[in-house]
Amino acid sequence: MGRQIKDKNFIGVDVKGNRMYNGAKIALQEQLTNVGFLRIQIGNILTYFAPGEVDEIWIIFPDPFLRDGKAKNRLTHPKFLAMYQQFLKPGARINLKTDSPELFQFTIDTVQEQACKVHTLQHDIYAKGPVEWPLSIQTYYEGLHLADNRKINFISFSLPDKPIVIPPKKKKEDGQ
């Protein structure tokens, strides 16, 4: 995206440096001055952005955290939406591209529960043939998933003006 849109900044955020390596290498080789990377835990993201500083978020093939009790780690969980709400501009979009049906449905449910505005909702984005930019940009992982004949889903939404409601933590039962 940084190649095509020179007048905007793009910042990749991940805790694992190896996932950002290729992008950083390309940005250096092509002298893309509008591309940067943060190797941080996502829970610390508020340290790096001021209120209203971010125009848009792209969440591309994140860990879906499918094991029991791990949904709170999904990047579209209300606790993260509440964080994003603190630095996104009003009306800014959050975009999720994933091969995980569970994460996709979780996100749809969360978006509905939080009264977010849905701009685009696409199941199996490649079902009707080639897709337009920027959805046509494929990551390494997306290529692997497509080779496995997995369906790629996409949702784009905006957060509501009212604060995101974070559900209470579930108590463990019987010492579990």
Which sequence ranges carry the predicted segments?
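S-adenosyl-L-methionine
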Residues: 23-59
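Conserved class I S-adenosyl-L-methionine
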Residues: 66-71, 95-114
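Class I S-adenosyl-L-methionine
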Residues: 109-176
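Conserved SAM/SAH-binding beta-strand->alpha-helix loop
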Residues: 16
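A short glycine-rich, Lys/Arg-flanked "PGG" loop and its adjoining helix->strand segment in the class I
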Residues: 74-93
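Short beta-strand element of Class I
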Residues: 1, 8-11
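A short SAM/SAH-binding and catalytic strip from SAM-dependent methyltransferases
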Residues: 54-75
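Conserved SAM-binding loop
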Residues: 12, 37, 96
